[in-house]
């Protein structure tokens, strides 16, 4: 089944999504991290990155917010590049836990591996795997360069957010040392946790995340810079991880209602990948009870449903002028 969509259609639907959703008052800012609690709750932006490099934007698409857990996708890509898909499967895994993203119980139940790079335990383990082992500065450079390559522009560390995160990350400290107990962290636990905390504190925009999603959708080639960031054979690995655990224990509901693999973060960002078609991101700080942006979810669902797109419907989608 073939489906053609014009760029003007996408522009119209993105604008409609913004107008439909911007007045929604549901959810509240994350209050357990002081920096996030104080961000303007009315901020809202959407960006779609087409595979020709064109971005379609509306609202606060260029506001820098904390990337938070969306960064897990980026570092998963980095270790897939450095180690290969099979080694990552063996050292971390790719399975959903069915439990909250910061669960310690998940480690106790399945201590043979941290289960997936897209939950906290697996993400801390992923940071420990980044090479060169034992060199915090060079590991950090690799993490930032990878995000820059994916987004097409450099993220900026939000120092206030980093300090807030570091002062309140008691649960993650427990996770790091529990991983050490089970030999599932591959560098110094404190270093690995600090790298994870710092990467979550990087400031990005909805437009940047849409380009990163577009890079995944485009087989590893950044649509804007045209740089081959990773091998195309990794796209299905990355997309499957996002589909199964991008919304944590609610990933099934998300996939059923939206039809697009997407990753969420408590900073208010959501990044979605439609392979071969486009990358999309939306940002708004108020979150639902599971830590997912209310407006971003509604906006992306609106775009997908209005355009009649779904990763599972088997359609070959062509975007035309």
From Swiss-Prot:
TM regions (residue ranges): none
Q: Which transformation does this protein catalyse, written as a reaction?
A: L-glutamine + H2O = L-glutamate + NH4(+)
The protein's matches in InterPro entries, at most eight in alphabetical order, are given as: Beta-lactam/transpept-like, Glutaminase
Could you tell me which SUPFAM superfamilies the record lists for this protein?
beta-lactamase/transpeptidase-like (SSF56601)
* An annotated GO BP: glutamate biosynthetic process
Enzyme Commission (EC) number: 3.5.1.2
Q: Give the coiled coil ranges.
A: none
Q: Name one GO molecular function term.
A: glutaminase activity
* Residues where substrate binds: 69, 120, 165, 172, 196, 248, 266
Keywords assigned: Hydrolase
Top EC group: hydrolase
One Pfam entry for this protein is Glutaminase
Q: Which residues form the signal peptide?
A: none
**Description of how the protein assembles with itself and partners:** Homotetramer.
In the record, the note on similarity to other proteins reads: Belongs to the glutaminase family.
The record's NCBIfam families line, in alphabetical order, gives: Gln_ase (TIGR03814), PRK12356.1 (NF009020)
Q: What is this protein called?
A: Glutaminase
Q: Which organism is it from?
A: Bacteroides fragilis (strain YCH46)
Name of the coding gene: glsA
């Amino acid at each position: 089944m073939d489906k053609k969509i014009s760029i003007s259609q996408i522009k119209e639907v993105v604008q409609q999504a913004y107008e439909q959703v911007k007045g929604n008052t549901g959810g509240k800012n994350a209050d357990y991290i002081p920096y996030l609690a104080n961000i303007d709750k009315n901020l809202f932006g959407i960006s779609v990155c087409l595979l020709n490099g064109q971005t379609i934007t509306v609202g606060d698409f260029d506001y820098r917010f904390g990337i938070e857990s969306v960064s897990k996708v980026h570092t998963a890509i980095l270790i897939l590049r450095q180690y290969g898909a099979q080694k990552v499967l063996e050292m971390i895994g790719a399975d959903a836990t069915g439990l909250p993203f910061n669960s310690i119980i998940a480690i106790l139940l399945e201590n043979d591996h941290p289960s997936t790079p897209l939950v906290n335990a697996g993400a801390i383990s992923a940071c420990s795997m980044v090479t060169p082992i034992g060199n915090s500065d060079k590991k950090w450079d690799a993490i930032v360069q990878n995000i820059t390559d994916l987004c097409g522009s450099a993220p900026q560390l939000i120092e206030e957010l980093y300090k807030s995160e570091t002062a309140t990350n008691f649960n993650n400290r427990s996770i790091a040392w529990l991983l050490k107990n089970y030999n599932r962290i591959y560098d110094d636990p404190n270093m690995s946790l600090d790298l994870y905390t710092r990467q979550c504190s990087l400031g990005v925009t909805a437009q940047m995340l849409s380009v990163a999603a577009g890079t995944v959708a485009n087989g590893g080639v950044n649509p804007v810079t045209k740089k081959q960031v990773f091998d195309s054979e990794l796209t299905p690995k990355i997309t499957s991880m996002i589909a199964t655990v991008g919304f944590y224990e609610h990933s099934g509901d998300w996939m059923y209602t939206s039809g697009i693999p997407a990753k969420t973060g408590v900073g208010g960002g959501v990044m979605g990948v439609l392979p071969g078609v486009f990358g999309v991101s939306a940002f708004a700080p108020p979150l639902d009870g599971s830590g997912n942006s209310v407006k971003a979810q509604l906006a992306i669902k609106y775009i997908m449903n209005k355009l009649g797109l779904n990763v599972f419907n088997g359609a070959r989608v062509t975007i035309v002028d």
